[in-house]
Amino acid sequence: LPQIAVPLHAPELAPGQWIQGPPVSIAFARGAVVLVDFWESTCVNCLRTLPYLKAWHERYAGRGLIIVGVHTPEWEFTADPEVVATAVRAEGIPYPVILDEGRGTWLRFANHYWPAHYLIDARGYLRYEHFGEGAYGETEEWIQRLLREAGDSAPMPGQLAPVRNEDRPGAVCYPATRETHLGFHRGKLLAPEGYRPGEEVRHRARPEGPAPAGMFSVRGLWLHEAEYLETREPGAELDLLCEASGVNLVLEPAGELEVELDGRPVPAGERGADIVERDGRTFAVWERARMVRLVDSPVFRQRHLVLRFPQPGVRAYAFSFSTCAIPT
């Protein structure tokens, strides 16, 4: 099994607010196996790993595994402890979670990714790391291996079955459109007006046809901020072309918007979990600031989305995309 070539003493967690306890210290956890999970409540890849983390907690917490969720925020609003606490409750996370607001733990681990998993053995050494989704079977093998090294001689359960079809053998993960940020700091707005940091800008017309993949266009009155674009009048529109099987958008605060996919309402077999149908039209509805699921399809292909915002004051941060599909 792949492993860290030269095991190193694991760094201690940096001071931070414990969203869910009890607090954990790497030093005082000697004798136990610790899995440190760097995650973010609006990160689609992080959210997709949670079913496995929760299952491992249920399977192995009584046998000496301690999972610690380190929430390192990507956005200013996800540094709010109450936002994180709400996400922890909504996702049903059962293990301790610390808010890494200043990225102290992120820097101590020299981490660069969401999600990232680090396994620490009973002696306090880093033994295994994995970045991104996947390798769930390999990670569970390492959990079992380190528990055995710590003295657990009882039979181990068989590996957890894949929780999604796209995690099973035979699924194909295609190159997809990269995460698309909307704010001026990292965004790629296709508009003759361009970005005007901190200003309200009226975008009068979209360019002919959809924007190239990875770029987007808007119409109506929008406020340009570093992390997000904010609607400033009813009826503002956002236009995106992407290649993906699933499409998500980080939005703040609670609200709703109309979604069209390829010039029509989102078909029933491709609707994300937050899409509802009303009078033959499809809308995304969300009850708190979070990642909103717009499209969820078993098929990977090019998609053209148009979003219409019925109210001002909605902040749109970034699109993320799922890429894995089941061959037909």
Residue ranges and their predicted role:
Residues 84-120:
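Short, internal strand/loop/helix patches
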Residues 30-34, 62-66, 93-95, 122:
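Loop/turn elements at helix/coil->beta-strand transitions in domains of secreted/extracellular proteins
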Residues 34, 114-116, 254:
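Short loop/turn microsegments at loop-to-beta-strand junctions
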Residues 111-113, 122-150:
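Non-catalytic, surface beta->alpha helical segment in thiol-disulfide oxidoreductase systems
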Residues 24-47, 53, 67:
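Short active-site neighborhood of thiol/selenol oxidoreductases, capturing the structured segment around
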Residues 47-90, 101-105:
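Structural microenvironment flanking redox-active thiols in thiol-disulfide oxidoreductases
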Residues 1-24, 29, 137-328:
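Non-globular targeting/processing and membrane-anchoring segments
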